[in-house]
Amino acid sequence: MKHLLSIADLSKDDIIGLMDEADRFREALLGRDIKKLPTLRGRTIFTLFYENSTRTRSSFETAGKWMSADVINISAGSSSVKKGESLKDTGLTLSAIGADAIVMRHYSSGAAEQLARWVAPGGVGPSVINAGDGAHQHPTQALLDAVTIRQRLGDIDGRKVVIVGDCLHSRVVRSNVDLLTTLGAEVVLVGPPTLLPAGIDTWPVRYSYDMDAEIYDADVVMMLRVQQERMHGGFFPTHREYATLYGLSAERERKLQDHTIVMHPGPMLRGMEINFGVADAPRTAVLQQVSNGVHTRMAVLFTLIAGQDAAAF
């Protein structure tokens, strides 16, 4: 495996292998006062973000540093990108400096795949990891979500996962649909008609406009933020009406099955898609997702940079 650009590029065995590796990193770090492994000592990782990020960027940085790599953050707003430098020239510059991996978030779908072609022609050059490209893919988010579901519920096969909210603009949805259906889950997308993707009839999912008809027999309820920064029109009448129809209220949370877990890729809009109290409820796995994000990204970085046959510890 040279790059991680899309969940669709991974086989079922690839997915399970990365999840298992994430669990091994978590176990290796348990109880350590100093979270440091020599796994990627002497390696250089660049993070290149053209969009804002808290969880993904800091998680990748932490993952690299916990494996003793040198991690260098490049912000598009404070680099030569601001002067008009192209993505191609930025990527080639980082490659020439000596990058072993480039972790990139970009506002354009397909940008990570294009970068990989530029910096690693013929498979020679740094690995590229897609940290989110437009509304296309966010593969490490789907991997960490699967790791979290497996930790909470055991096997993913046969589980019902309901994803509620702005599915139209969400790269998380697309990656999770690819991954969860590959592992045998039933996936249901719920949202207003204006926030469900065109062509959804061809996806391996069911979809519904009625949240209450789907969530009460679900094993996982995953809430999504309304991505207002990607909207240029009226996708729903008011925030209050949206919260009434598609928000996870305290009343709805009480009616869920006892074992059902609530997830959210973040950032959360408390009071809109999720109630303030529900966001902090014991069944809500948001912070576990964040923790698993570090271990999952350690697994990805290790696999791509050191190689699948290398020893991690």
Curated annotation (Swiss-Prot):
Transmembrane segments: none annotated. GO terms for biological process: 'de novo' pyrimidine nucleobase biosynthetic process; 'de novo' UMP biosynthetic process; amino acid metabolic process. Carbamoyl phosphate binds at R55, T56, R105, H138, Q141, G266, P267. InterPro entries: Asp/Orn_carbamoyltranf_P-bd, Asp/Orn_carbamoylTrfase, Asp/Orn_carbamoylTrfase_sf, Asp_carbamoyltransf, Asp_carbamoyltransf_Asp/Orn-bd. It is an enzyme of class 2 (transferase). GO terms for cellular component: cytosol. Keywords: Pyrimidine biosynthesis, Transferase. It comes from the Bacteria. L-aspartate binds at K83, R171, R225. GO terms for molecular function: amino acid binding; aspartate carbamoyltransferase activity. Its EC number is 2.1.3.2. It catalyses: carbamoyl phosphate + L-aspartate = N-carbamoyl-L-aspartate + phosphate + H(+). Pathway: Pyrimidine metabolism; UMP biosynthesis via de novo pathway; (S)-dihydroorotate from bicarbonate: step 2/3. Catalyzes the condensation of carbamoyl phosphate and aspartate to form carbamoyl aspartate and inorganic phosphate, the committed step in the de novo pyrimidine nucleotide biosynthesis pathway. PANTHER family: ASPARTATE CARBAMOYLTRANSFERASE, ORNITHINE CARBAMOYLTRANSFERASE, MITOCHONDRIAL. Heterododecamer (2C3:3R2) of six catalytic PyrB chains organized as two trimers (C3), and six regulatory PyrI chains organized as three dimers (R2). Belongs to the aspartate/ornithine carbamoyltransferase superfamily. ATCase family. NCBIfam families: asp_carb_tr, PRK00856.1. This is Aspartate carbamoyltransferase catalytic subunit. The gene is pyrB.
